[in-house]
């Protein structure tokens, strides 16, 4: 995979591919890959081979205990345009309402719904690298979610893996689809994975009525304590997978560093 070298440059380890499923559809899209929540644990290293997982040493007094505090923390750690690098601007609408978050329905389409009861707060922001010099626009997004417990955050990660198995292709928004995915997962402490307790990555193909396709698609998600962060990059004509991945990795690295700074114990 061409984008993997960029992960090392930002201190995020390469994720070992779990499954590659390629399926045909009328739209030419392929199949994301994954496993069930129970299988996600089995896919990780065994107790005999795994390195100790790095867990952020947080100050309990700095962890949010209610929705107001969670929203305040999210506002301090979620990516802004500069988090992805130069040339990135806000898209409109810039932020989703904190009263909704994306849910993959039985129809394999993403919908905005009320957050689950185990979510203290969540926020999504949208960005873009404008079209220039014969290259189409790159559409980016960032999500930060604060769960009530660490276990709730870990279940969100497991459910993300299950979703890619359940839906051969996915509709992101009206006229947008993804497929032909390579999925990977890595637990904290495995293969140098020290930026979070758990990390997921997908890359594949993105098509839309507005931008055509297929183009490069990259998604990453990570979990640390009660927090999950995710970033998505959707390519366009003239944009390489490596270019999209570099943007996503930079945004993820920024958010993970900000979370650590916001909640870690201070000497």
Which residues are covered by each model-predicted region?
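Sec-dependent bacterial lipoprotein signal peptides
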Residues: 1-22
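Short, well-ordered beta-strand elements
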Residues: 140-143, 226-235
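A small/polar (G/S/T-enriched), proline-flanked helix-loop surface module common
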Residues: 52, 56-60, 88-217, 251, ...
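N-terminal low-complexity, Pro/Thr-rich disordered segments
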Residues: 18-72, 260-267
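Short, surface-exposed beta-strand/loop micro-motifs that present aromatic residues
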Residues: 216-224
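A short acidic/glycine-rich loop-to-helix N-cap element
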Residues: 233-250
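Extracytoplasmic/secreted envelope proteins and their assembly/folding machinery
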Residues: 71, 75-81, 154-161, 249-252, ...
């Amino acid at each position: 995979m061409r984008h993997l070298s960029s992960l090392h440059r930002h201190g995020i380890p390469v994720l070992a591919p779990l499954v590659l499923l390629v399926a045909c559809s009328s739209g030419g899209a392929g199949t994301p890959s994954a496993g069930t929540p129970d299988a996600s644990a089995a896919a990780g290293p065994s107790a005999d081979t795994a390195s100790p997982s790095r867990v952020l040493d947080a100050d309990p007094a700095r962890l949010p205990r209610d929705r107001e505090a969670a929203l305040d923390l999210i506002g301090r750690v979620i990516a802004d345009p500069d988090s992805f690098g130069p040339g990135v601007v806000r898209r409109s609408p810039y932020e989703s309402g904190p009263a909704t978050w994306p849910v993959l329905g039985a129809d394999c389409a993403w919908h905005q719904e009320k957050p689950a009861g185990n979510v203290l707060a969540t926020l999504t922001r949208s960005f873009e690298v404008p079209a220039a010099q014969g290259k189409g626009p790159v559409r980016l997004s960032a999500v930060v979610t604060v769960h009530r417990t660490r276990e709730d955050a870990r279940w969100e990660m497991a459910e993300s893996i299950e979703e890619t198995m359940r839906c051969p292709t996915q509709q992101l928004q009206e006229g947008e689809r993804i497929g032909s995915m390579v999925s990977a997962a890595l637990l904290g402490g495995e293969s140098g994975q020290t930026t979070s307790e758990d990390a997921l990555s997908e890359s594949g193909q993105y098509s839309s009525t507005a931008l055509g396709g297929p183009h490069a698609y990259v998604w990453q998600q990570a979990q640390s304590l009660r927090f999950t962060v995710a970033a998505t990059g959707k390519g366009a004509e003239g944009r390489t997978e490596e270019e999209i991945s570099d943007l996503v990795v930079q945004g993820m690295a920024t958010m993970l560093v900000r979370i650590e700074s916001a909640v870690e114990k201070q000497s």
